[in-house]
Design a protein with these regions (language model features):
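Residue at a conserved register position within TPR or TPR-like alpha-solenoid repeats
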Residues: 44, 93, 100, 143, ...
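Residues that mark the junctions of alpha-helical repeat units in TPR/alpha-solenoid scaffolds
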Residues: 33, 53, 82, 89, ...
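"A position-specific structural signal for the A-helix of alpha-solenoid helical repeats
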Residues: 39-40, 88, 95, 138-141, ...
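Residue register within tetratricopeptide repeats
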Residues: 51, 107, 153, 157, ...
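Alpha-helical segment of the N-proximal tetratricopeptide repeat
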Residues: 32-66, 102, 152, 203-214, ...
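Structured C-terminal portions of repeat-based eukaryotic scaffold domains
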Residues: 49, 255-435, 446-449
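Flexible helix-coil transition and linker loops at the boundaries of alpha-helical arrays
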Residues: 26, 64-89, 117-137, 166-198, ...
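Structural motif corresponding to the intra-repeat A-B loop/turn of tetratricopeptide repeats
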Residues: 47, 96, 103, 149, ...
């Protein structure tokens, strides 16, 4: 689930040609190299210079389409050259689509994705296995994005198309390596990355059966099958998508002990990065005792800690992990195979893990109200309960909600959508206030003791 830098626009170069006969000066503009334009667009996108990135990609796509049309009309051009141009254009269209979706233009994004997939219809003509694999991998990426933009069976069809292409891509890359035709670390890395993509695609299918397609007759079996295939591809060094998705399924099946083990294993994959990030906001294991520990002096990540933090899964994924950890903590008492001591230990393991994950999210973005609320829930779920820390985070989330409500009430709330949003804020305020009231009762009990 799931955080700004700038790049200057490119300048057109001018070439001056002087005529010896009349002394006239003719200015001619040399067109920018499209590869350079695309490189600049990539950098702009990576540094969140969205407007410039979209302009550069749009310029590149327009000119690549012109080149493709010329190449189609030129019978001398080779199929390999044409395929390379199509691949380049499809990737540019895909990047444009990503940007448009990110700024709310879902229709434009979907159109660009569709145009890109249409370019890659059919099979690559080249006999080179690497070229064939690149073709299929590019098309798979587009369908994975389309799956995220659509719902129900449309999304399922997109994911299944991507899965088919990724499986073919793996066969091509593996065959090339096994035959000894190619000995290249880049190809080996591409094979590993493609397997990870396939693992993620299976997880996306499973997620569909847990949500949009949950009422399908075969939903549970289809979800289980997809996740078993994902786990076969799971790499202990990669993101724990499959483990977390399986934990979610096991919770829905009331198989709580399995879910507990799965989500803790998933957390162990990201623990180092989460702890490093949580330490930035005073939520490391040794600093989480007091609520005021969040007010610590600025710290900076370095070395292994920085690398671990940079490799963390996205914001939404970690937020979901924290919720699963808290849910498992609340269900430990239902696991009959654990004795009382083990139940307390496992519960606190889940709670502490959730605090570290939420701390990493708070360090990334401290303006998400839900993270403050969930931290309050985590500290109040500990055994023994950390009421002081829980109160600190609940009070901050309450203040943020009240500020949002005040801003909304200052605007126009005549339409149904605004009224619904305001009602949701009121419900959340009530929920947080109830949590604080319960903490007040706990404080009174402690004083009596």
């Amino acid at each position: 689930m799931p955080p700004t830098k700038r790049i200057s626009s490119s300048k057109k170069k001018k070439k001056l040609d002087r005529s010896n006969s009349k002394g006239n000066v003719n200015n001619s503009i040399t067109a920018p190299d499209l590869n350079e334009v695309i490189s600049q667009a990539d950098v702009a996108l990576e540094t969140s210079d969205i407007d410039n990135a979209l302009k550069l990609y749009t310029y590149a796509s327009t000119n690549l389409k012109i080149e493709l049309q010329k190449m189609t009309e030129n019978i001398i051009a080779s199929e390999e050259e044409r395929e390379a141009l199509i691949l380049s254009l499809s990737k540019v269209l895909g990047k444009m689509a990503e940007i448009k979706v990110s700024i709310g233009d879902h229709f434009g994004g979907r159109q660009d994705f569709t145009d890109a997939t249409n370019l890659l219809n059919g099979e690559a003509v080249s006999n080179n296995p690497i070229s064939k694999a690149q073709w299929k991998e590019a098309r798979a990426n587009l369908y994975l994005y389309l799956g995220q933009l659509t719902n129900c069976t449309d999304a399922l069809n997109a994911f299944q198309t991507a899965i088919g292409d990724l499986k073919d891509c793996i066969v091509l890359l593996d065959s090339a390596l096994q035959d000894g035709d190619i000995q290249d670390d880049n190809v080996q890395n591409a094979l590993i990355e493609t397997k990870q993509q396939l693992c993620g695609a299976y997880c996306s299918v499973a997620e569909l059966y847990l949500t949009d397609l949950c009422y399908e007759p075969n939903a549970e079996n289809a979800c289980e099958e997809a996740l078993q295939l994902a786990l076969q591809l799971d790499d202990p060094k990669s993101s724990p998508d499959a483990l977390q998705a399986m934990a979610n399924l096991r919770l829905s099946q009331k198989r709580n002990k399995e879910a507990l083990n799965l989500v803790l294993n998933a957390y162990n994959r990201v623990r180092e990065g989460c702890e490093a990030m949580a330490d930035l906001v005073g939520l490391s294991n040794k600093e989480a005792e007091e609520a005021n520990d969040v007010r610590v002096e600025a710290k900076e990540l370095q070395g292994d800690a920085l690398e671990a933090a940079n490799s963390l899964p996205g914001f939404e994924f970690r937020c979901q992990m924290a919720k699963l950890l808290l849910e498992c903590a609340s269900l430990v008492e239902t696991i009959d195979s654990l004795n009382d001591g083990d139940k307390k230990k496992q519960k606190n393991s889940c709670v502490e893990a959730s605090i570290q994950v939420l701390g990493s999210l708070l360090a990334e973005n401290d303006e998400v109200i839900e993270i403050w609320f969930l931290l309050g829930c985590a500290f109040s779920s500990a055994d023994p309960k950390n009421s002081q820390s829980a109160r600190y985070y609940f009070e901050n989330s309450l203040e943020m909600l009240q500020n949002v409500k005040k801003i909304m009430e200052q605007g126009d709330i005549d339409d149904e959508e605004s009224m619904t949003a305001l009602n949701e804020i009121d419900e959340k305020i009530t929920e947080v206030q109830e949590k604080l009231d319960l903490l007040g009762d706990d404080d009174e009990d402690m004083e009596e003791d």
